[in-house]
């Protein structure tokens, strides 16, 4: 069946910090997918991405390039970028009509219910359009806790949520 949307994981792109190359890819993607929604994601190394480690200023610059290009419908902003950076990037995205997915990934464990709840609440309060957490369960109970937090927060928050239990 046909895809509902496309996500470009730019951290896999060799020229990710070359503005012209990034704009060429975004423009090509838009021509290929037409009006299908496009999510642009640069996953940092600390959040499990394929790119080399980068500074916060390089990360912010990439996000602003993508927003300025106008081809992405949604942009992924990492919760770990911090409150001040997130606020600046969310404001820029919304001013350009770009929706924001705020994401957080824990590759070691499933955090406590309180931590997962606080992260999702923080994402919603920041102005993110969609909150996303991905965790690493070590038991069926961990997966059940994630589902319970997701159900509880879906009822409490106005923004949609994406949650996932990762693993092999």
Label for each model-derived stretch:
Residues 1-95, 99-112:
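Active-site beta->alpha loop and helix N-cap motifs at the rims of alpha/beta catalytic domains
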Residues 74, 79-168:
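Catalytic alpha/beta core domains of metabolic enzymes, predominantly
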